[in-house]
């Protein structure tokens, strides 16, 4: 995610300089960009946070940042960062592309930014306007609670799976280099094998013919 953060470093520099009470929290295994070290007193680096503790951490901030550089890979990412923040009533400012652009209603239940100018303008607005910030977060929570939790959709999902169930399944992955998203896909592949399915993996690059994980062996 370093490229994603570096994309908005010029914006963060201006905001931290203009708003001395502003604090930036960076969670995850990332290095602080050199350009931001001047504002080290306003920046907290937290490192890896256990997933069970992450909602509480997101709830502790006023604005959740989700910048994404415009790449094919990022356009295929989900809107999970918006969902995670919405469920704890924290407003999200995200790049206007991919699933964010499809899911988030700009100014209604989140904030979408196309370029550096919009990032600067909209983040300063959220910093200055607490009522607007809380209203957007509240609407995001309401919509996410209705549309994005399994309590309302689990039955429909199960019915769809039963209708389309196939004991032979294929997963198409960009590569076999392990990342968060690929790891999740492989865990689902293991679940399907345990349920009796035959699973094959397809990759867009690489020469591996088999993938081995514990007791599981997948043809690639």
Regions found by a protein language model. Give the residues of each.
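Flexible glycine-rich beta->alpha loop in the catalytic core of nucleotide-sugar glycosyltransferases
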Residues: 30, 70-71, 91, 98-99, ...
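Conserved catalytic-core segment of nucleotide-activated headgroup transferases in glycan assembly
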Residues: 1-59, 184-190, 195
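Conserved acidic donor-binding segment of nucleotide-sugar-dependent glycosyltransferases
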Residues: 106-117, 125-131
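A charged, aromatic-enriched C-terminal amphipathic alpha-helix characteristic of glycosyltransferases
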Residues: 131-162
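N-terminal strand-loop element at the rim of the active site
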Residues: 174-179, 197-220
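Short acidic active-site motifs
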Residues: 52-53, 118, 122
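Short, polar loop motifs at secondary-structure junctions
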Residues: 27-34, 96-99, 204-207
């Amino acid at each position: 995610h370093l490229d994603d953060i570096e994309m908005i470093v010029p914006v963060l520099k201006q905001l931290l300089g203009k708003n001395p009470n502003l604090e930036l929290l960076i969670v995850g295994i990332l290095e602080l960009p050199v350009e931001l070290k001047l504002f080290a007193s306003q920046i907290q680096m937290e490192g890896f946070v256990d997933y069970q503790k992450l909602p509480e951490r997101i709830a502790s901030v006023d604005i959740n940042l989700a910048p994404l550089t415009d790449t094919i890979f990022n356009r295929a990412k989900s809107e999970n960062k918006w969902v995670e923040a919405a469920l704890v009533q924290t407003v999200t400012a995200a790049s206007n592309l991919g699933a964010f652009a499809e899911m988030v209603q700009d100014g209604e239940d989140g904030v979408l930014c196309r370029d550096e100018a919009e990032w600067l303008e909209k983040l300063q607005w959220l910093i200055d306007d607490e009522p607007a910030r809380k209203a957007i977060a509240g609407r995001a929570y309401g919509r996410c609670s209705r549309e994005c939790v399994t309590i309302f959709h689990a039955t429909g999902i199960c019915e769809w799976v039963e209708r389309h169930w196939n004991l032979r399944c294929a997963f198409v992955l960009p590569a076999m280099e392990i990342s968060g998203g690929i790891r999740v896909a492989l865990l689902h592949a293991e679940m399907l094998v345990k349920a009796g399915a035959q699973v094959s993996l397809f990759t867009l690059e690489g020469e591996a013919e088999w993938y081995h994980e514990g007791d599981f062996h997948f043809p690639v």
